[in-house]
Amino acid sequence: MAYCASRFHTVRRRTVAVKVGAVGIGGANPLRLQSMTTSDTQDVDLTVRQCIALAEVGCEIVRITAPNVPAAKCLGSIREKFTAAGFGAVPLVADIHFLPSAAMEAVEHVEKVRVNPGNYADKKRFAAREYTDAEYDRELQRLNDTFSPLVRRCRELGRSLRIGTNHGSLSDRIMNRFGDTPLGMVESALEFVRIAETHGCHDLVLSMKASNPKVMIQAYRLLVERMDAAHRPYPLHLGVTEAGDGEDGRIKGAIGIGTLLLDGLGDTIRVSLTEDSVYEIPVARAIADKAMSLWGSTPPPAEDLRLDRDPVVAINPGSWDPVDPLHFSRRETTTLQFSDRCAAGPEQPPRVVVRVPGVHDLAQTAAGFAAASMDETPAEGWLLSIPDAETLLELQRILSKLAQLPVADGRARPVGAPGTPDDPAVRIRQADSRGSIGAGALPGGFLALELAQSITIGDLARFEPAVCGSLVVCRWFDASTAAELTAWAGFVRASGHFLAIDTRPEEIPALADTLRALGDDRLLFTVSRLKNHAVGAHALGAYRALAGQLLLAGSRAPIWIRNTAANAVRDDSGYLGRLIESSFLTGGLLCDGLGDLVSVETETDPVRATKLAYNLLQGAGARISKAEFVACPSCGRTLFDLQSTTQRIRAKTGHLKGVKIAIMGCIVNGPGEMADADFGYVGGAPGKINLYVGRDCVQHNLPQADADDRLIALIKEHGRWMEPPAPIGTA
């Protein structure tokens, strides 16, 4: 059973429509935007002001925590005052953990109740034990007895329910039988779905949240596969939990949410950020608009889709997709050694290529990288567009000048070891204002030339890149140029270069015989532009199809992911739009195990483009270049200022490459939600912090004023600390 109609074009999943007050989710409704208040729910006036602020920036559904019965009672006053302020059509949702009594009070006042199936009727003991079938059945009966009263009351009042699983807060029962896995997340939700259905309750929305986008994506896909096989086309609420703040938080959210939206899944979204919640809505709006632009027409209305009908109508039945969408594994590829310090292949991290604006900008660009702090985020390939043969000759002159090549014998100045006078980075920093020294030897990288079709093999044969080493020659090929492909492949092999074949997946069958004859040892593939932007077409699908066609052709050549304006779902001028587009494409492919090189060519500032590429790699879990922070969005349960705390801890520990630190406002988003974090900083009581190593709490009730230093001491104790590097120019 497929989890979506197509992985190559966006076809919206058919669902029943669920009403949350006056707002419809799923069916023919648009994507709905959600967020959550951060105030203490018992501070009614402040909570109402936050609800109003969210509604005014476009939030369509507002969630409020109800951690106990007194807080749940306050939802009545909040609803009344919010309605009196003119927002009666904006529904409120109660967020419930642990206390069924709070849920029973909350359902009297709000349009929807969200329950976390991992802790609604269970207390976490993190106990390893085997459950017999009889014991498991007794646990399910206990769950039924606890959850059924809420379901019945929801039906009586016309309320809807969200069954919202979180990866890190699965019950001991689920953990011991299914593990801390996407399957465990799905089973956790389905336990509650089955109970709701026994009472005739079908006003259900489901979610599968995790801080790891790969886990989140796999869980939603598995959930849909299981639900649709059982004819349960309930709507989905999408979100990446504990994504953090700033660019990293936006990237994680866009990767997880965007990948699923392009798969056609999702009916309502929240971009969780450790920031004021009003800042979540513009990001969610931008993501939703891009996704909805791919919907050719609205799906059938709710009355045309019954729970006993198959909601999936598959298209592209002849397409071959080599990816297992439910289990991550990286595509097997041939290794290409571009330089002594840079290779692409299955044992290598995805490599970062940066576009240089023009040949005359090469020196300035390289000098800019030397001046910036880029040791952990270097440009590993330098991409230049070559529109004609004259530009190629001009590049030759520039490289010769920059490398200070002696004219007499053509020998290049040697590339020295780091710190020596011939170290390229040293030479770049010593460059004069005209950039006359240094960029000829590109530090640790290779030169990629995107050639116009008018440039011939003869033109390139006259090009002597001197100290640049092997070139990656990027050129367009299609079914009409198979003979040219053979000639170009022969030339690059004889010259020690590499050929990046820019094409579209539909061209590969016509080139297959040629590719089999050529072998993979000098080839890589890319898609720089879609054939057209037909309804539902997107570059993510094109690259997936490319991987499938290469498999059919017997090719294991690496794939270069190029984020270009021609590949965008919608070409936006703003940085947020470019970030979202690159998260959709690069993040989605990396989470499927596809991609060996990455370039973000929509960002014109090379340093910024490179940093964005590395942030994309980190967000997708494909390459780690800095510390990672798992930080929950604030809510009424939070016991300290999450925003300032996250920023403060990042400033002190952000240089710790490969260390993952969870910053959680309270226990509900604490040890369970941290998943695979190395260290945790969790609110234990007002003004008190608990520190964790993994899931284990090792220090309790520390004064918040001391907690930062104690966290650093804990990191040192476990051998993960290093001193931050000195700023450039101070060493």
Residue ranges and their predicted role:
Residues D340-A372, D641-A685:
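C-terminal accessory/binding modules appended to enzymatic or scaffolding proteins
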Residues M1-S35, V151, R155-L157, S293-L362, ...:
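N-terminal amphipathic alpha-helix/helix-capping segment at the start of soluble metabolic enzymes
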Residues Y131-F147, V151-R152, D172-H327, E332-T333, ...:
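Catalytic alpha/beta core domains of metabolic enzymes, predominantly
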Residues V18-Q34, S39-G58, V62, N68-P70, ...:
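N-terminal glycine-rich anion-binding loops that anchor highly charged ligand groups
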Residues L33, D95, I163, L206, ...:
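Conserved, mostly hydrophobic/aromatic
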Residues S6-R7, R12, V44, A55, ...:
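Active-site beta->alpha loop and helix N-cap motifs at the rims of alpha/beta catalytic domains
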Residues P686-I689, D696-W721:
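Beta-strand/loop-dominated core regions that host nucleotide or nucleotide-derived cofactor-binding catalytic loops
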Residues G58-R63, V110-A127, L262-V278, G381-L384, ...:
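Glycine-rich phosphate-binding active-site loops on the catalytic face of alpha/beta enzymes
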